[in-house]
Amino acid sequence: MLTKAKLLRMSAKKYMAKKQLEFFTTQLTEQKSEALGEIEDARQRLRVPPECKDEADRASFEMESQLYLRIVDRKSKLVKKIDFALRRIKTGEYGYCMETGEPIGIERLLIRPTAEFCADIKYINDDKEKHFAE
């Protein structure tokens, strides 16, 4: 089995070769399974409201409900990104910047396996987004 350490030591010539793609497919599949489990857990908690006998109980339940709704939303978005990354693996586009076509880099993919852009382009896009928000 390919480890993170071995992955980092591989030569640039082997970038996104079969073993690396298998490694990231496994990582992404595990992340997806975990996220789906968290979504299901949050939905279960939302389905079974506790008996709220007073205002404090109702307020507490409302706060918890908002938290679980945010979890469902955030994890659902992650699942979509994971599915997109898995499709990119199948098409041979995974690991390459969607804007420049340059390698994203193993280090960045280990931190964020769903990365779609190299660090430079991501920084530029984030900076543009920040300026539009101001």
Model region roles, listed by residue range:
Residues 1-91, 131-134:
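Interaction interfaces in information-processing and related assembly proteins
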Residues 23, 99, 113:
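Amphipathic alpha-helical recognition patches that constitute DNA-binding helices
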Residues 97-101, 118:
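Short cysteine-rich clusters marking metal-coordination/redox-active sites
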Residues 104-105, 126:
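Short functional micro-motifs and their immediate structural scaffolds
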Residues 115-122:
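Cysteine-rich micro-motifs
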Residues 122-125, 129:
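Short, well-ordered alpha-helical segments in soluble proteins
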